[in-house]
């Protein structure tokens, strides 16, 4: 079977794929602007794929049926049931056979792009070290404070949440906690008006700039095991509890070497593939101009 020249369903397949990947919705839910953007992406993608599949490097590339089946399974797993998948296909006028053909086409394009990178040099330890020391700021881990909070909101429409009542309530909670801070999660579960109450007020490991400025400024001055005073934000009154502190630090080269090597290798591959595609498209354009000249 040849996948170089897809049938009428190819655009519908691409639209389904791009709608989900780029916009997180079904094709029928795209706005007019999004639809136009999707159509431009589809046109460009098909143009590139056609060029790749016609190039000499594609001649010897064969995609095994097992790889196509694996790709199909990954798509099917995105849906709650086989019926939901079939409904999505029906809505786009797609058939399973056509979908598998399009998957095979995509896999072949990717296989060709992988093949052209086969001769690229491996990223060496020296390459990794040079990048690390020239971009040291990328490997700084900010300070993190693991924190919990209790929120009492201000809402003048409710007697128990007027500014005065809310302040009285939060101060009473803080008073109970001052002698027993280990009860913070329990008090948060009972009294906090934030959804985090379900997790005992847990905010998790917080980095600077995450919370309201009023809370942020206080939290990053707190020590482990410390309670904050009553703090006010635009939504109400808070009490914070700092469970642990991780200071800012610089990741060592040894810590990040394997991941950084993979990242640089991928960047090298992407850059090479981009240049190769640009050259291929330029050659095709030149040939087309000569043919029509």
UniProtKB/Swiss-Prot annotation:
Q: Which InterPro entries match?
A: Nitrogen_fix_NifM (IPR014282), PPIase_dom_sf (IPR046357), PPIase_PpiC (IPR000297), PPIase_PpiC_CS (IPR023058), PrsA_foldase (IPR050245), Trigger_fact/SurA_dom_sf (IPR027304)
| Recorded GO MF terms | peptidyl-prolyl cis-trans isomerase activity
From its record, what is one biological process in GO terms?
Answer: nitrogen fixation
PpiC domain location, by residue? 142-244
Q: What is the disulfide pattern of this chain? A: none
Q: What does the UniProt keyword field contain?
A: Isomerase, Nitrogen fixation, Rotamase
Isomerase keyword on record: yes
Q: What class of enzyme is it?
A: isomerase
**EC number per UniProt:** 5.2.1.8
| Highest taxon, organism lineage | Bacteria
Q: Which Pfam families does this chain map to?
A: Rotamase
Catalytic reaction list? [protein]-peptidylproline (omega=180) = [protein]-peptidylproline (omega=0)
Isomerase in keyword set:
yes
PANTHER family per UniProt: PEPTIDYL-PROLYL CIS-TRANS ISOMERASE HP_0175-RELATED, PEPTIDYLPROLYL ISOMERASE
State the protein's purpose.
Required for the activation and stabilization of the iron-component (NifH) of nitrogenase. Probable PPIase.
Family statement: Belongs to the PpiC/parvulin rotamase family.
Q: What is this protein called?
A: Putative peptidyl-prolyl cis-trans isomerase NifM
Q: Which gene encodes it?
A: nifM
